[in-house]
Each structure stands twice: as structure tokens, then as C-alpha cells.
Amino acid sequence: MRRIEAMAKRVVFLMSDTGGGHRASAHALAEALHVLHGDAVQCQMVDLLTHYGTWPLSHAGAYYLPLVEQHRWLWRLGIGCSNQARLWQAVALSARLWQRGGLRRFAAEYPADLYVSVHPLLNHAPWWALRRRYPHTPFATVITDLASAPRPWYNPAVDLLSASCSQVQAAALRAGLPPARVLLGGLPIRLAFAASRPTPAEARAALRLEQRPTALLLGGGEGMGALEPTAATLAARLASQGGQLAVICGRNEALRSRLARQRWPGAVHVAGYVDNMPLWMAAADLV
């Protein structure tokens, strides 16, 4: 075992729990590498903002949901400002200087054969710190935003960028990445989503849902968006047509508790964070 570990290639994923998609994408990539290469590849995931960032970046995971839900204008302002090329260049340089102590510590503690970023804020300053310590170790970016991706995702110096869609691929080329380094790879998904699925009836039975038409309402890992009013509208419509609604609230425990206490007009099933999403999707007629 020690000999295998010594010979294994080491891949380190740079992520942060600002939303559920970044960690999920890293897990999907690590799962695929294990299926393809077994113990020949060892994967590690590092929440770089939480463990190596200074305040307020170190609390980004805790701040993310309140920011998006309660101060969305500020979140949109940040995205808009980051899309201004010169402004973002200044921010990236400032972050490099501001966070260099933690970045150097991360680079020293996590040597690897490949670094993969699955987070928009981890493609510039971390790349700089890693390139200084390991000048020949490749660095890749896998974009986990679907339809569009803000400028922080695009570092023309990375060795490979995997775009989630053709629009993101075009944006990467406009940002200065050479065509040979841009791959149209799509979104990473866990193998369970691609495997053969149970029938809706089988999935509903496994989840102890009633055997009736089912709509599934999702808000991502953090349970974001207008889930509560949408659930109210859907529940009323489905009740009048003999259907049922399942609402997955993710890590938003306040929302889950609130919805679970409500009196619904029909069959409504409320869950928090789940690790069997393929089964829930198989049970649904509408997502």
C-alpha cells in the first residue's frame, strides 16, 4: 500500500463551500478519476478560502447564503465589478498581496502533480503562489457555472480550462486563453446521474412517496432562490390535479423548518440536504 501511495499521482482540488456546486463538481471529478485510474491517482479537496484565507474570505461559506438571499444587490454589484477587466486585474493583484501568507502556506502543505480549481475566486492568486513554488506543475480550471461565467474564472495562464457550455468557451477565448487550452467539457456530474435509474414508481417507493404525479423543487446545495413562494404556488396547483410536490431545501435549515411547519393544500414532502439526489430526480415527473 505504501508503495502504491508513493507512486500515485496526486491531484488537489481548489474549492470553497460558497454554494453546493463547487464541492459537488470536485467530488464528481475525483470519482471519475478513481474509476478510470483506481489507486494510481489520489485526490484531495481543499477549501482554500476557509482554511487559508483571512477574514472575511475565511467566512465566505457562512456569508454566502445571507449575501445572495438578503443582499442580492451587493452580490450582483460584485459580479458586475468583477466583469470589468481593469478593475478585476487590480482586485486580483491586491488579493495576491493580501492573501500571500496563506497561499504560500497552502502551496507548502499541498504538493501535487496537478491542481484543479472549481471555484471562480481560486484561479489567479492561488495560481500565482503555486507557480512560484512549483513552476512545472500544471494548473487547470473547471468552470461550474452553466450558462455564463464571470471574468474571475478566466486566467489566460492556466494550462487547461474546461468550459461548461459553448458560451463559456467563447468567453474564455475572448479573455485571452489560447484555443488549444480550452476544452468544451460540460458540467461534471456524479456517475450516479449517468447510471441506469429506477422507474418513477420504484423511486417513489424507495423514498416513501405516494404513487402520483410528482414535481421536484430544488434550490441548490444552499437552498437559495424563491423556493417558498414557488412551493406555495406549485402545491396549490398540484393539489387541484392530484399531484404531489417534493421540496429539497439543501443546507437552508431555516427554510426547511419553516416549510415543514406549514399546512399545505395537498401532498408536500420537505427535505433538507440529501445525498441521494439521483433517486429524487428519478421519482419526479417535473424538476
Give a label for each model feature.
Residues F13, M45, T141, L217, ...:
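Structural beta-sheet core signal
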Residues A28-Y110:
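Conserved N-terminal ligand/cofactor-binding loop architecture of enzyme catalytic domains
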Residues L77-G176, R181:
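Active-site and donor-binding regions of nucleotide-sugar-utilizing enzymes
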Residues I143, G186, G272-V274:
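Short loop/edge segments at beta-strand edges and connector loops
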Residues D159-G221, G250-A254:
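A nucleotide-sugar donor-handling region in carbohydrate enzymes
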